[in-house]
Amino acid sequence: MCSLRLLLSDSYDPWFNLSLEEYIYKNIPKKQSILFLWRNQNTVVIGRAQNAWKECNTRRMERDGIKLARRNSGGGAVFHDLGNTCFTFISTQEHYDKSISSNIVLNGLSYIGIKAIISGRNDIVIRTENGEHRKISGSAYRETSGRKFHHGTLLLHVDIDKLDYYLNPDFKKLETKGITSIRSRVANLNELKPGINHQEVCLGLTEAFFQHYGMKVKPEILSTDNFCKIPEFFKQFNKQSDWNWNFGSAPAFTHQLDTRFDWGSVTLHCDIERGIIHRSHIFTDSLDPSPLEILAKKLVGIPYNNKSILCCCKEWMQSWPQYKKELSEVSHWLIKTIS
């Protein structure tokens, strides 16, 4: 006999929700199936093997207060806001696979009057009025030690402009070994059903979940108050919210950037591993390359973010007061470009 749980998060914090998801996954008992429903506010979520700098515009995100969250599953980068419903199916049933949860999602949408189909391995699509298939859901699957995990998103009324705005990185010369997101043509469910909301979708998914298992359970509301004192959860949350996980876990990559100032051209070549600059070289045709050669050495060993670059440049500029204007231009350029 399989037991069921229906879990609802009252938090919009992506680090909390992803930590909660991981905690539930690691602690689910045998012969249990769980549906966890949640939402994130203004977040870019990237896959476990992705490079944040390649997938999204980190400078815009930092300026606008958009969080970055790296999940523990694979897949591509997605933008979340409150027009997005997240679902997670977790099970320790012996014969469980993602086709079960995928069909629950399709049936849940059908209950609220939306016809959708599976496309490829991980996507759910709808057919628009002009006959075009558009993606409304992407998902990822993982399995370890008898525990199965399938999570994904449903686009209800996501701000598509923000999706494009934050998921389009700056034009940078990046070479990376990470997994690159494949941009798909997406659609919001409110194009088919105006006024659709999170509560309505959750009711549809819940009904399909109960229908599949032939039983009903009361929903459990999960909040930060329930979990903040649990050491295992707290450890997971610290990891999930840490720069070293969200940015530093990126695969090794190379960043080359160049520009021209009135006094000469500058090309910076950096090799980054786990979010740290491991090698740096600057090429320039300036009449005195010495300050830039010193800067290249100072960049080695610091985190690849604009705060660290700013601290490095401030210290560096103090050693060359005679070049204050030129070095200020270089500093401003680096801080603006590396973010």
UniProtKB/Swiss-Prot annotation:
GO-annotated cellular components: cytosol
InterPro entries: aa-tRNA-synth_II/BPL/LPL (IPR045864), BPL_LPL_catalytic (IPR004143), Lipoate_ligase_A (IPR023741), Lipoate_protein_ligase_C (IPR019491), LipoylTrfase_LipoateP_Ligase (IPR004562)
Reaction(s) this enzyme catalyzes, per UniProt: L-lysyl-[lipoyl-carrier protein] + (R)-lipoate + ATP = N(6)-[(R)-lipoyl]-L-lysyl-[lipoyl-carrier protein] + AMP + diphosphate + H(+)
GO MF terms, alphabetically ordered: ATP binding; lipoate-protein ligase activity; lipoyltransferase activity
Principal subcellular localisation of the protein: cytoplasm
Presence of the UniProt keyword Membrane in the record: no
GO biological process: protein modification process
Binding site for ATP: 71, 76-79, 135
This protein's pathway: Protein modification; protein lipoylation via exogenous pathway; protein N(6)-(lipoyl)lysine from lipoate: step 1/2; Protein modification; protein lipoylation via exogenous pathway; protein N(6)-(lipoyl)lysine from lipoate: step 2/2
NCBIfam families per UniProt: lipoyltrans
Family, as annotated: Belongs to the LplA family.
Subunit note: Monomer.
The protein, known as: Lipoate-protein ligase A
Source species: Blochmanniella pennsylvanica (strain BPEN)
Organism ancestry: Bacteria, Pseudomonadati, Pseudomonadota, Gammaproteobacteria, Enterobacterales
Gene for this chain: lplA
